[in-house]
């Protein structure tokens, strides 16, 4: 079963075109969603939330069409974005009182548990909260109605490492107790490496990668060596590369393939999500 499915989806906004012929997001996992600014992450999320409609194609959440069943879909989604838009003068308890009745699945004990976990004072006004506390409260509100899909859009951006880790801990603990899927858009790739199960990478409106994260990090590899080893034919085998006066660094999809090509003549290093993004955005050039 899939949490999210895109089928032949296109959306044009000015000169930008989002083009996703097929995308499946597995149910019950945390899927990291990464890409450069302007790659299409925000457009994708707005389509999922029903804030935009596709020009063509179909989007499903838990097998239900987002376009034709918008009200039903919104009850299935917990959303944490940046910024969160609760009224600044409202107390947290009043915000909860306003929103809870919209959800038949609202769990008051879960709400109380998470607000205590984050030491949030319900008498406090939303506008008085720090950036970190606002993100924590938004996460509590998203989790308390027990959605089947949680969409996170930069939930830890601008937060210190301690608060970021607290948010990740609560998210992962919640997933152990509830049947839920997470679609996690962020530029903080280390958070995805800590918590993610799958990675989706988007570039220029097109999906470039969608695969298990552990498989990706185990297989993708950085090779580095003198320029004379990297002929034009070999460069074609690289997913991306960078040249400098010291030589060439390149990204390969498989260390086994790289060893067949280079043997012991180059250095090998494990790649991170950030490395993969940098090399895929740089198909060749100097630094």
List each language-model region with its residue ranges.
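ABC-family P-loop ATPase nucleotide-binding domains
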Residues: 75, 81-137
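Catalytic Walker B motif of ABC-type/P-loop ATPase nucleotide-binding domains
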Residues: 150-154
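Conserved beta-strand
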Residues: 6-9, 16-26, 57
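Helix-to-loop junction immediately C-terminal to a conserved catalytic motif
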Residues: 49
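Conserved ABC transporter NBD signature motif
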Residues: 57-68, 72-73
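ABC transporter nucleotide-binding domain
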Residues: 168-252
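Walker A (P-loop) phosphate-binding loop of ABC-type ATPase nucleotide-binding domains
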Residues: 36-40
